[in-house]
């Protein structure tokens, strides 16, 4: 299927690893010009190298900035005033006992997980509406609808993304611009693979065996009973970024392997 993304400019925030990197790779494979973002120049350049190793003709641009700050968002807006596709993928998470999370951590999660998307969307969405063309996608989590007690601050920001995305979609009424949210389930990113390698230190388990045990013990409601691969998320996001998805707007879309036991 030709997704008609050749020549489209896509900004993928937090795209030097995990789901963000996979999305950048998938968009590049479809011919989009992709802006790679991260806080560290060496990681951004390594990502570009990795994508070019698979897609030598990919058109890639560098955007080194900390988008968890207003200054970082300003830098990216200045470097790329107009984009056709904005993937608000940047996000931080870490387990923490609710009673031990100080105000500063709540504000840090809010700045990174929410305000990065707010600041960029505030700039790019108006231009998209004026041009009557564009895609904005927020990468949330199944935690948005199934909050985690050990990550209350993270879960709260993911739920907020659903409301934010729907509010912004309302602004696109009558245009060819869409705003949606994708909610991945547990995904085998680099960080999760590292966790699996250390989760059962006293047992000689392969990564595959550790994955199966983790899913059985910690994600028993998953229908597929395995971790989702970043590429599976990325390919769906790429479709959602394309003109082919024009009838999907204001939606919160789960890619969780059936983890959330709900028909809605």
Regions found by a protein language model. Give the residues of each.
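Alpha-helical segment proximal to the catalytic Tyr-Lys
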Residues: 126, 170-171, 246
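Short, small/polar-rich loop/turn modules that mediate ligand/substrate recognition or access, typified
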Residues: 173, 178, 248-250
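Substrate-binding pocket helix/loop in short-chain dehydrogenase/reductase
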Residues: 97-98, 105-110, 218
């Amino acid at each position: 299927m030709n997704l008609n993304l050749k020549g489209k400019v896509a900004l993928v925030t937090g795209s030097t690893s995990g789901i963000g990197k996979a999305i950048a790779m998938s968009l590049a494979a479809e011919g989009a010009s992709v802006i790679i973002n991260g806080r560290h120049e060496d990681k951004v350049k390594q990502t570009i190298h990795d994508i070019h190793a698979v897609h030598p003709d990919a058109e890639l641009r560098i955007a080194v900035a900390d988008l968890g700050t207003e200054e970082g968002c300003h830098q990216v807006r200045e470097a790329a005033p107009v984009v056709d596709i904005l993937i608000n993928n940047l996000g931080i998470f870490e387990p923490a006992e609710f009673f031990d999370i100080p105000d500063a951590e709540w504000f840090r999660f809010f700045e990174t997980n929410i305000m990065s998307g707010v600041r960029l969307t505030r700039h790019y969405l108006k231009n998209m509406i004026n041009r009557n063309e564009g895609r904005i996608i927020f990468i949330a989590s199944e935690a948005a609808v199934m909050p985690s007690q050990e990550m209350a601050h993270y879960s709260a920001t993911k739920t907020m993304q659903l409301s934010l995305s729907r509010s912004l979609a309302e602004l696109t009424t009558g245009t060819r611009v869409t705003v949606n949210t994708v909610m991945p389930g547990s995904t085998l990113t680099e960080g999760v693979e590292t966790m699996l390698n250390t989760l059962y230190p006293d047992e000689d388990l392969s990564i595959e065996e550790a994955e199966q045990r983790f899913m059985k013990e910690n994600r028993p409601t998953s229908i597929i009973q395995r971790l989702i691969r970043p590429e599976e998320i990325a390919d769906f996001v790429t479709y959602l970024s394309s003109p082919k998805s024009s009838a999907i707007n204001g939606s919160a879309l789960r890619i969780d392997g059936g983890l959330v036991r709900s028909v809605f």
